[in-house]
Amino acid sequence: MNDACLLFPASKELDSQNVAVILADDMKHSESILQLGSGAPRKGFPLTSSPLLPMVTPWPFSQDHAAPTLYSLLVAYYKSFQSQKLDPPKWLWQCLGDPSGRKCMVTQFLLPPLGQVRISCYRNLTSIVICQAVDPWENNNEADWRKNPMARPRIKCDHALCFKVVYEGTLWRPHDQKCWLIRLTEGHKYGMEELSPGDWKILQESRPYPYGPIGEDPNLQYAVGVKMKVIGGPLTSTVLALKALSFHRVNICNMDNPSLGEGHAPLRYSHALKAYGPQYGSCEERVWQTATKCIGPEEENYWCEYDHRGFFPMVPNKLSPTWVRHAAPYCIQRFATPYDLQYFANELLPPGFSITTPKGVSYTSDRRLHYGNEGTLQEYNENCDKVKRGYDEISSSDYSDEN
């Protein structure tokens, strides 16, 4: 448990069953735990006042109730097969026991581009474990990757992607539920490292390639472009949660994108990645989060210790301190969808200018031209005269109607 600023819930807040499931199961690979949902501490804190689960996922999950999250998983599961004109296999449930000996109903399935999902339903608790590194079509899992660094998977299990969320309650309870978010690290249970090359091959052959062409399919954009841009950051869990919340807030503001309980990909991810911010953090982001009281003033409130990955140490090098790392300019990826390109054309280019893809498709900026700060004095005066004539025509028309 590396993130000291996130406190574990006291045992008196939970019954024995919850303690066994949340704390005892796979503690070794749990990065941190954050209480969310009903009754969460620090009311008004951005993470607890939002209904969104602060984890980077293809569509938003709920932190207030298990039902919207599970329903979105079910919808996405069926849509992923129907989009390929395949009959979706039924969810198979098994009655199993957890490490504490408690019985629960368990199902596990693969859902691109999200990853491997494991759902455990107890009498008064719902647990979901998601490993986003499991993608046999766009990630590699070679037999000797532990010995050969060059064979390591390009998308590893990381606390920015892999997580366990536990809701205190069942699907049929109408009121808001307590929720705990546990970030998981490399080697966690029910993750990629438990799959052998044979398992990987079976999953890969279980269905056709589920993604569309580069630059056209937002699912492929998420599977590669988004995951590669969020893993590996030497940032604390609170910082990652704040960045994930910004990621979802931008997406959910577009009415065409999925909301809570809707399991499908949005139109684009580039603007959400831009809101997510620098993958490895920056001094600008740290200053903003500190100034808004989202994190503490100490460096360890922003950067975390990742010695085993070769990133920044907890105590920075005086010749190269972490707080001088500036955010790099945001770049458009080749996975950007047509909606992304049109968005950036409108945002970055003057009216009439365009972006042309290698296939010859052009996206022309149609934003409004502001003559006050984008025109010459002559153009500005001509525009003022045009606006004045328009007002005069309206005034004369109203005067003639009155007569």
Swiss-Prot record:
GO biological-process terms attached to the record: positive regulation of DNA-templated transcription; viral process
UniProt protein name: Protein Bel-2
Record-linked InterPro entries: Foamy_BEL (IPR004956)
Note: Bel-2 expression is low.
Family note: Belongs to the spumavirus protein Bel-2 family.
Domain of life: Viruses
Residue ranges the record marks as coiled coil: none
Native organism: Simian foamy virus type 1 (SFVmac)
